[in-house]
Each structure stands twice: as C-alpha cells, then as structure tokens.
C-alpha cells in the first residue's frame, strides 16, 4: 500500500518514524523507564511538560475557534489541568509553578507553539497535536505503569496518563486517525504538516536531552 492510498495517518507514521525512534529511545527516557532514575526526575519531566502542554492547548483553542479540524481537536484530550493536579501531588502540595525554569529546549518548543497559535496555523497545530496526544494514548500508558513499578508513584499523581472522558482508547485512536485522513488539505499544507510532525519529535527529543544533562 502506498502512502498516496493509505492516507495521512500512515504518511505521518512513516515520515516521522526515524525522529520518533530517536525521541522514544533517548537516554533520559530509557533510564527513567528502566528504573535507573527517581521520582525527582519524573517530576522534572512533568513540570517541563506542563509548560509545553499549556502552550499546545492554547494553540489548539485558537485553531479550533477558527473552524479548522474541530472534531480532531477534542478538548477531552487536554492534559494541562490534570497535569497540574498531578504536580500538586508530586510536590506534596507545595507551590511549584513559580519555581519552574523552562529548559532551553522547552523555551524553543513553547515559542514554536505560540507562533502557531498567533498565526492560527491549523496544519502545523495538527502535527504537534498528533505527536503528543497519540503518543499519550499509546506509550503513555506504559509510562504510568513503569512509574508505579519502579518508583512507587502514587496513582493519584499519574492522572495525566488516564483519559477519563475516553472509554476505549483503541477505538478513539482509530477514530483519530480517520479524522486525520479526512482533513481537507492542499498539497502544500500536507507537506508542511508532515515536516512539522518530524520537527515536533525533534523538539521532544531535545527536551529529553536537556533533562538528561547533569544526571
């Protein structure tokens, strides 16, 4: 089956495969998932994630309001608020927002998401949306189990990985891919979306690289 007949979802998977593999197997994430780090490092990851999810969801709000990809940009996927509740738990209720310092990679990531928001760039937003949320619906479930197994993280601090508004994850993911395939895009928009998705994985890899510095 060629990408031309397979649809955008398959094109995205194929065109981002190398960047996805690199991000997924970063040293930081490998160490975290294999039990070589600790709750402190997991907390740092989630704090940085809160910064870029906040920016991502503000961009999604702007694009959704424009009428582009409304059904795809489902607010049930939003993670920033539940992530904040997790961080309250991980920080034992102490104030954490004011002490977070965005890493250089997160600054770059957030700047790009804010640019997408300001330009109401629907295809670019969909690329970042796909990379983050489809990953959360898939590999995120593994991360939650590993955080409990290796570090004893309280399940109440892992709400980020549980999508309360989504009953069946596989069905939802299949529907998400079908919505991707049904997007009306020009050839230029499609090409830009595919490139942006690879860029999104690169941003994520750089975030993990920054987190791994000094360990």
Curated annotation (Swiss-Prot):
Named from the GO MF annotations, one term is: heme oxygenase (decyclizing) activity
EC code(s) of this entry: 1.14.14.18
InterPro entries, from UniProt?
Haem_Oase, Haem_Oase-like, Haem_Oase-like_multi-hlx, Haem_oxygenase_CS
Its UniProt entry gives the catalysed reaction(s) as: heme b + 3 reduced [NADPH--hemoprotein reductase] + 3 O2 = biliverdin IXalpha + CO + Fe(2+) + 3 oxidized [NADPH--hemoprotein reductase] + 3 H2O + H(+)
Instruction: Tell me what gene encodes this.
Output: hmuO
Residues recorded as binding heme b, renumbered to this chain, are 20
Report the family membership: Belongs to the heme oxygenase family.
Look up the record and give one Gene Ontology term from the biological process aspect.
heme catabolic process
Please explain the role this protein plays, according to its UniProt record.
Allows the bacteria to use the host heme as an iron source. Involved in the oxidation of heme and subsequent release of iron from the heme moiety.
Please verify whether the record's keywords include Disulfide bond. no
Q: Which SUPFAM superfamilies match?
A: Heme oxygenase-like
User: What keywords tag this UniProt record?
Assistant: Heme, Iron, Metal-binding, Oxidoreductase
Designated name of the protein: Heme oxygenase
The organism of origin for this protein: Corynebacterium diphtheriae (strain ATCC 700971 / NCTC 13129 / Biotype gravis)
Q: Which Pfam families match?
A: Heme_oxygenase
Q: Which residues form the signal peptide?
A: none
């Amino acid at each position: 089956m060629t990408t031309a007949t397979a649809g955008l979802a398959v094109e995205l998977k194929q065109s981002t495969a190398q960047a996805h593999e690199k991000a997924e197997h970063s040293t930081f994430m490998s160490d975290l998932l294999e039990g070589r780090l600790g709750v402190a490092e997991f907390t740092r990851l989630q704090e940085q994630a809160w910064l870029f999810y906040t920016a991502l969801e503000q961009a999604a709000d702007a694009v959704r309001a424009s009428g582009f990809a409304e059904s795809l940009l489902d607010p049930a996927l939003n993670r920033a608020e539940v992530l904040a509740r997790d961080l309250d738990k991980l920080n034992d209720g102490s104030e954490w927002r004011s002490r977070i310092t965005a890493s250089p990679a997160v600054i770059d990531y957030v700047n790009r998401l804010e640019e997408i928001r300001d330009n109401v760039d629907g295809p670019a937003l969909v690329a970042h949306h796909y990379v983050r949320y489809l990953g959360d619906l898939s590999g995120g479930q593994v991360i939650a189990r590993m955080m409990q197994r290796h570090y004893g993280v309280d399940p109440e601090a892992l709400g980020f990985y549980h999508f309360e508004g989504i009953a069946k994850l596989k069905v939802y993911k299949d529907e998400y891919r079908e919505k991707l395939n049904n997007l009306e895009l020009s050839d230029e928009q499609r090409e830009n979306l595919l490139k942006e998705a690879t860029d999104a994985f690169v941003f994520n890899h750089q975030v993990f690289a920054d987190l791994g510095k000094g360990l």
